[in-house]
Every structure is written in C-alpha cells, then in structure tokens.
C-alpha cells in the first residue's frame, strides 16, 4: 500500500475518497493525528496524484459533493468530538504556530498591564547603537500589538496560514519563513518609521505571499491561498499606503514581508521542479 496524502479535516478526506471511487480507484482512510489516505493498487498512483492536485485547487467543486451522493457515503461514519471548533484550532496548528500565538498574547497582556513603552524598551528594534548586539530585538517586535483588533487580526491569519505551512511542510519551514520575514520586514519598517513599531503583520504578509505562490506553482505541496485573498491583501496594502481608513499601519513591513514570501516560494518551487 502507498500513502498518498493526509488531511486535517476528515470530511475533506472522505470527499476525495468518494470522488476517486466514482473514478474506479479505491482508497482507504486511516485515522491518526490526521486522516491518512492510502492506495492499495500502486500502479494507479500517478493518476491519483493528478486528481489530488485538482482537488486541492478547488475542493469545493460540486462534482466532489455529487460523488459523495453517488457513492452513497454522505455519512462517513466518522465520530466527531463535541467541540469541533476547538478541535479545528488544535488540529490545524503545530507547536511553532501555538508558541508564537502564546508569545503574542503574553506580550499583549504585559503591554496592557505595565504599558506599551515599558515593554517596547525591552523588545523593540534597536533604538540606540549600543543595543545593536541585543540580537533578539531584530525579531521580538513581531510579538507586540497595540490594540485588540490588531492582535486578533494578525493571530487569525497567522493560525490560518502558519498552521497550514507547519502541518504540510513542517515546523522548520515555518521557522525559516518567520525568522527571515521578521528580520527583513523589520529592517524595512524601521527605515520608514524608526524603531517604534510592532506586530506580526510583516510575517503574515510573507506567509500570504508564500502560500499563494507555492500553491500556484506546486499544487502537490498541499497548501494554497485563493486568488481573491491575495488580491484583498494587495488592495489592503494600497489602502494602507494612502491612509484611506485613517489607521497607522506598518506599510513598509507589509510590502517587504509580501516580497520575502513570494521570493521564498519561488526559490522553493524552483528547486522542487529541478528535482522532478
């Protein structure tokens, strides 16, 4: 038997299995931390991978729902936990995703209790030449948020995008994207506004760029971002640049992060194509 892929959502896994059954290919699901899909007849592996790439590009296509009805398997027989929302939060995020989220929450609470300035003195980008060897400052600015909406918006995107990268490509890949984008987006932002800035948005934009381009160029990676969302991200950058909403935003970090993410995805998919 050959393992084809894994899905965090068992219903999505069942939809793909049902569709392949209508195509004459029998797949089985084994439940572990995720729903692992296995193929008994390995001679059909290439065909399954082609169909999987199409499925990942548009899992909501009506033909997949129709396949579930046709196969008579609209009830997958899977048992779901009583708290599906909490289960989804846990299953979609790996340890790095959770650690960064926890760090952001802890820092936000500290800023609320003892004041923004006190925390920024310890975590902000080096604001004095004598601080340039305090290496953590080049990265810890991503943990600081200045309003509830600011942190909620960033953590939601971080969980959605960072969790997908970590689950599909590994914790190491998420760490590399986070470290590089935090450093470069922070460098650009301090050139625009000085050292007094914070937020995870530079990393979030890097993840947006990475996930979108990686999904476009390498569908078998299992990660993708709908084109409408990347268009929204670009429009948000334009709106922020011209201050249409009257909010102070780290425009330099957003643009730099997006470029970093696109560049990393291009390099990764270039290497993947060379290997194939």
From Swiss-Prot:
Can you state which reaction this protein catalyses? Cleaves type-1 transmembrane domains using a catalytic dyad composed of serine and histidine that are contributed by different transmembrane domains
Matches recorded under SUPFAM superfamilies: Rhomboid-like
User: Which positions are catalytic residues?
Assistant: 201, 254
Q: Name one GO molecular function term.
A: serine-type endopeptidase activity
Write down the Gene3D superfamilies for this protein, in alphabetical order. Answer: 3.30.70.2350, Rhomboid-like (1.20.1540.10)
Output the InterPro entries linked to this UniProt entry. GlpG_N_sf, Peptidase_S54_GlpG_N, Peptidase_S54_rhomboid_dom, Rhomboid-like_sf, Rhomboid_protease_GlpG
Mostly located where?
A: membrane
| GO biological-process terms attached to the record | proteolysis
Query: Per the record, what is one GO cellular component?
Result: plasma membrane
Keywords in alphabetical order, please.
Answer: Cell inner membrane, Cell membrane, Hydrolase, Membrane, Protease, Serine protease, Transmembrane, Transmembrane helix
The EC number of this protein is: 3.4.21.105
Query: Does the record's keyword annotation contain Hydrolase?
Result: yes
Q: Where are the transmembrane segments?
A: 94-114, 142-162, 169-189, 192-212, 229-249, 250-270
* Location in the cell: Cell inner membrane
**Its function?**
Rhomboid-type serine protease that catalyzes intramembrane proteolysis.
By what name is this protein known?
Rhomboid protease GlpG
Q: Which organism is it from?
A: Salmonella paratyphi A (strain AKU_12601)
